[in-house]
Amino acid sequence: MTHLKITGMTCDSCAAHVKEALEKVPGVQSAIVSYAKGAAQLALDPGTAPDALTAAVAGLGYKAMLADAPPTDNRTGLFDKVRGWMGAADKGSGAERPLQVAVIGSGGAAMAAALKAVEQGAQVTLIERGTIGGTCVNVGCVPSKIMIRAAHIAHLRRESPFDGGMPPTPPTILRERLLAQQQARVEELRHAKYEGILDGNSAITVRHGEARFKDDRDLSVSLNEGGERVVMFDRCLVATGASPAMPPIPGLKESPYWTSTEALVSDTIPERLAVIGSSVVALELAQAFARLGSQVTILARNTLFFRDDPSIGEAVTAAFRAEGIKVLEHTQASQVAHVNGEDPQVATVGYSEAEAHHDGIETDSRTLTLDNVPRALANFDTRGFIKLVIEEGSGRLIGVQVVAPEAGELIQTAVLAIRNRMTVQELADQLFPYLTMVEGLKLAAQTFTKDVKQLSCCAG
């Protein structure tokens, strides 16, 4: 058996990709890759080059070295071989023409693949039957975050924490104007990040139409402007995304229901809104509409965030109910009459305790409520917590769960800590700027060895 040390993996999915890459290297019989151990165990044919193994891992953006050998950066020429094993074109192969790549779709995955293919020397034809940009910029991340931001400002005006010094004022919501501002920014970003990039890249040809496979080397594209065009390819990526699934509830199809797509472009705020589901998208929109004036009821088949640490769902449910949002847990809609980012935010990385135990990893953990974070106190907003999960024995940080108004900003520091295989003590020993929310990570790390309630503001 040959053993590799691998750094840079952040989750089990990373390990799965590394395993797939290693098993494509000639001479590798099998590979067992563990994210938790940062290691791989391989069965090899005699004469298999160790450098080929480390290059395969490097091709995914991670670092690998033989467990019993010093590190080496001498990988000249191996990356091209890795690309070949992964099914990509070898720019140095001396081919008479560039690799022809067809990409069906124009969202984030399609764009990333098209640009990477061009970077490696390919010619790309990108086919889109609808609006360039896919879900995120048009009907997903961008408009939803703009709407959530508007709803957050409405909430701040309505719920001032400063009592008589800055009395709250019920906001006037002009949804039509908010929608116009939202869509203007959507169009701006779509042009800047998608249309403009495609127009400026001579190696990418865009066809507006619907594609179907003619055979294993040709696509037939029914152009939106009329007519058909055949697109020949050496490689084809189908990156068409997904669409909402409608639950089989009697009467739903006959009702004026929304998916997230319709909700984000509605020019009215409904008086009452029932949200069926408890996914991030459902909860983000539920809270946004509640803050903009709707009476919102969430129907959750289980609890909120039931796949995560239970304390996350409990904290978000309490926050929603405090805002007047009805949360009905363990409830399923049986019939319809015929007539996110949620706040506080939720951010997680790595293992939850349950996931670690499922994978056979013994853990220890600490949870720091935000009333122990000075910046949260200064903000008059102590909703939420920071939870750190470590590997028992080694003390290595393997998971972080955060519920906080700025959870999305905090989590990147946790990502870096896990990616660099830091121990909780190493995290506790870092210098963090005082009176910032991210300081909460240091304080949470300190709770493994100290009572942070007994520390002065800048001590530790």
From Swiss-Prot:
GO MF annotation terms: flavin adenine dinucleotide binding; mercury (II) reductase (NADP+) activity; metal ion binding; NAD(P)H dehydrogenase (quinone) activity; oxidoreductase activity, acting on a sulfur group of donors, NAD(P) as acceptor
Listed cofactors: FAD
The protein's Enzyme Commission number: 1.16.1.1
Ligand binding (Hg(2+)): C457, C458
Catalysed reactions, semicolon-separated: Hg + NADP(+) + H(+) = Hg(2+) + NADPH
Gene Ontology process terms (BP): response to mercury ion
The UniProt record lists the keyword Repeat: no
Record note on quaternary structure: Homodimer.
Binding site for FAD: A110, G130, T135, K145, A211
Note: The active site is a redox-active disulfide bond.
Catalytic EC class: oxidoreductase
Function: Resistance to Hg(2+) in bacteria appears to be governed by a specialized system which includes mercuric reductase. MerA protein is responsible for volatilizing mercury as Hg(0).
Keywords: Disulfide bond, FAD, Flavoprotein, Mercuric resistance, Mercury, Metal-binding, NADP, Oxidoreductase, Plasmid, Redox-active center
InterPro entries xref list: FAD/NAD-bd_sf, FAD/NAD-binding_dom, FAD/NAD-linked_Rdtase_dimer_sf, Heavy-metal-associated_CS, HMA_dom, HMA_dom_sf, Pyr_nuc-diS_OxRdtase, Pyr_nucl-diS_OxRdtase_dimer
The keyword Cytoplasm is assigned to this record: no
Disulfide bonds: C136-C141
Organism ancestry: Bacteria, Pseudomonadati, Pseudomonadota, Gammaproteobacteria, Enterobacterales
Pfam families assigned to the protein according to its UniProt record, in alphabetical order: HMA, Pyr_redox_2, Pyr_redox_dim
Domain HMA: 1-65
Similarity comment: family membership: Belongs to the class-I pyridine nucleotide-disulfide oxidoreductase family.
The record's free-text note on cofactor binding: Binds 1 FAD per subunit.
Organism name: Serratia marcescens
Domain of life: Bacteria
Signal peptide, first to last residue: none
Binding-site positions, a metal cation: C11, C14
Protein name: Mercuric reductase
